[in-house]
């Protein structure tokens, strides 16, 4: 009966065990956008990002801890995943920089997954409940990972579709340009031959 009574709370825990939201942002040329989350020491954090539109689809990324220590830094990255455990209590900042771009804004999709804060297991008086909560938390983490994979597959599909559309558009315009050149050359040759025979007739 205890397991049955715990089931509703476990279902709620499965959806609340991890804090995770996805965002689309636009970063102007020479611009930088920073975000922050306040967590306790030992909390697992995972940054996932992908450039959806703009230029060469690259961005500079940096994660900075509360002590101003650089935890992760990457330059001209198209996409990435970085997971780490908070080494101390405080506010963690993660910044996306488009300062390398001279005129092209970038559209970026990102999410920061924040796990549960570590618990003091010495104060737990119900080993079965603790084990069940841990299993539900792991399941929630796996479901969140699958969700993000699906979302970023959609972003990649959007990028590839945009590239294909641009390529097809360029092919169509190039074919149209070639047709105009061919028509112009044909008309030029006809005009030249007509003038040539008119001159010979006069002579």
From Swiss-Prot:
Boundaries of every GOLD domain copy: 32-114
> What is this entry's stated membrane topology?
Single-pass type I membrane protein
**Residue spans crossing the bilayer:** 171-191
List the Lumenal topological domains: 23-170
InterPro entries assigned: Emp24-like, GOLD_dom, GOLD_dom_sf
Q: Reply yes or no: does the keyword Transmembrane apply.
A: yes
UniProt keyword annotations, A-Z: Cytoplasmic vesicle, Membrane, Protein transport, Signal, Transmembrane, Transmembrane helix, Transport
Cellular compartment(s): Cytoplasmic vesicle membrane
| GO terms classed as biological process | endoplasmic reticulum to Golgi vesicle-mediated transport; Golgi organization; intracellular protein transport
Query: What Pfam families does the record tag this protein with?
Result: EMP24_GP25L
Keyword Transmembrane helix applies: yes
Signal sequence region? 1-22
Stretches of the chain found on the membrane's Cytoplasmic side: 192-203
GO CC annotations?
COPII-coated ER to Golgi transport vesicle; cytoplasmic vesicle membrane; endoplasmic reticulum; endoplasmic reticulum-Golgi intermediate compartment; Golgi apparatus
- Family that this chain belongs to: Belongs to the EMP24/GP25L family.
Q: Briefly state the protein's biological role.
A: Could have a role in the budding of coatomer-coated and other species of coated vesicles.
Q: What is this protein called?
A: Transmembrane emp24 domain-containing protein
Source species of the chain: Nematostella vectensis (Starlet sea anemone)
């Amino acid at each position: 009966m205890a397991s049955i009574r715990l089931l509703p709370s476990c279902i709620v825990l499965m959806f609340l065990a991890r804090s995770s939201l996805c965002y689309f942002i636009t970063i102007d040329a020479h611009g930088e956008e920073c975000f922050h989350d306040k967590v306790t020491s030992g909390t697992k954090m995972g940054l996932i990002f992908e450039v959806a539109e703009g230029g060469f689809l690259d961005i500079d990324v940096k994660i900075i801890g509360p002590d101003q220590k650089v935890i992760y830094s990457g330059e001209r990255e198209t996409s990435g995943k970085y997971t780490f455990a908070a080494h101390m209590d405080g506010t963690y900042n993660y910044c996306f920089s488009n300062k390398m771009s001279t005129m092209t804004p970038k559209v970026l999709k990102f999410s920061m997954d924040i796990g549960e804060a570590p618990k003091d297991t010495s104060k737990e008086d119900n080993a079965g409940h603790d084990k069940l909560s841990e299993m539900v938390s792991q399941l929630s983490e796996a479901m969140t990972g699958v969700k993000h994979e699906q979302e970023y597959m959609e972003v990649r599909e959007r990028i590839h579709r945009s590239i294909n559309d641009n390529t097809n558009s360029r092919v169509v315009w190039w074919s149209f340009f070639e047709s105009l050149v061919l028509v112009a050359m044909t008309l030029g040759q006809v005009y030249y031959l007509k003038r040539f025979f008119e001159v010979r007739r006069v002579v």
